[in-house]
A protein has these predicted regions:
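Acidic, metal/ion-coordinating pockets
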Residues: 1-103
Length: 103
């Protein structure tokens, strides 16, 4: 039996307001793959005390995690920019949406 491993990379969902549209063009491929694994480049948490116009950022609103609906797992070892609270909030959110994580 052949399985397909589909890799997505360097995903940053900062500023995402419509998570269901992010992977719309490749949704069938994601759904049909045996395993989908991606590199998550952001933490899912609400950052306090920042300028809303700021363009730098490796964080995204927790609601954006639903964009990963067709992902089985993500790597998140590089998400250390905002500290332990942000990392733990992100891991918790990934657990809530049913996406496995490593790193």
């Amino acid at each position: 039996m052949t399985q397909t491993l589909l890799l997505t990379g360097d995903m940053n969902f900062q500023g995402v307001t419509a998570p269901d549209t992010i992977f719309a063009k490749v949704a069938d491929a994601l759904r049909d793959a045996g395993v989908v694994f991606g590199n998550l480049e952001c933490c899912f948490f609400e950052r306090q005390g920042h300028d809303p116009g700021e363009r730098e950022g490796f964080y995204a609103p927790p609601a954006a995690a639903t964009a990963l609906a067709n992902h089985d797992a993500v790597g998140c070892a590089n998400n250390v920019t905002y500290g332990e609270d942000a990392v733990m909030a992100s891991v918790s959110r990934l657990d809530q949406v049913g996406v496995l994580h490593t790193g």
